[in-house]
Amino acid sequence: MRGPVGVRRDIEDTMRMLKLLRRNWCVLIDDRPSYLGMLQKIKDYVTWGEVEPDTVAALLKKRGELEGGRPVTDEYVSEHTEYDSVEEFARAYCEFEAELDDIPKLKPFFRLHPPRGGYERGGIKKPYTLGGALGYRGKAINDLLERMI
């Protein structure tokens, strides 16, 4: 949501560790406790939730980028992984059977547009629970990502 400019050094370092280097970038991480602690630390600058396989597949197909700027295709996934399509890989990823590192040369972030229709009414300065866009939002992250892809 918000970029790392003008923030405390420890928050900037945490955002760098998560590869969130610019506004409107997206990374997919699992729910291990160390990641959840990092998200709590930067909760006033990002939003997060649980993604569905359809959203992961759309992210990979439309915004996934390989080294050299090449797009992620079904052919590339079937040649370089044990999965036949991006949708099958996304399903396996959401069930914790695959990692994004299984796709060779995939960049670890997704560069997204600002959301169509804007952020929630409270903007990017209030938490999601108070009508804003920041912090934990659960399954509602899928709606936001669909508007940003």
From Swiss-Prot:
Pfam family, one: Ribosomal_L30
NCBIfam families found in the cross-reference section: PRK06049.1, uL30_arch
CDD domains tied to this protein: Ribosomal_L7_archeal_euk
Keywords linked to the UniProt accession: Ribonucleoprotein, Ribosomal protein
Domain of life (superkingdom): Archaea
Keyword Ribosomal protein listed: yes
HAMAP family: Ribosomal_uL30_A (MF_01371_A)
Subunit and partners: Part of the 50S ribosomal subunit.
Protein name: Large ribosomal subunit protein uL30
Alphabetized InterPro entries for the sequence: Ribo_uL30_ferredoxin-like_sf, Ribosomal_uL30, Ribosomal_uL30_arc, Ribosomal_uL30_euk_arc, Ribosomal_uL30_ferredoxin-like
Family recorded in the similarity comment: Belongs to the universal ribosomal protein uL30 family.
Entry's Gene Ontology cellular component terms: cytosolic large ribosomal subunit
Any one Gene Ontology molecular-function term assigned to this protein's record: RNA binding
Biological process terms in GO annotation: maturation of LSU-rRNA from tricistronic rRNA transcript (SSU-rRNA, 5.8S rRNA, LSU-rRNA); translation
Native organism: Methanopyrus kandleri (strain AV19 / DSM 6324 / JCM 9639 / NBRC 100938)
